[in-house]
């Protein structure tokens, strides 16, 4: 399945990276690399992620990558990464 990043998810990745890089550039690089590596798990086993409890829709799932939640939607021909949130950040439908 093809993986597509929503504009929101791409912005989240950039903003999270900038925030972390201010204090620890090496950690920022490692987190981005780990998030990109997580795409392989999502692509190979999209249903493996758990249903996002705040949304409670079967097609919207998440996997964890360190302290981050990668939230994605399983569609017929692609997987859409909706957002990347730190575990401490509140998630609402408006964030998707």
Label for each model-derived stretch:
Residues 2-59:
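Basic, Lys/Arg-enriched alpha-helical interface segments
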Residues 47-77:
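Basic/aromatic recognition patch in beta-strand/loop cores that engages polyanionic ligands
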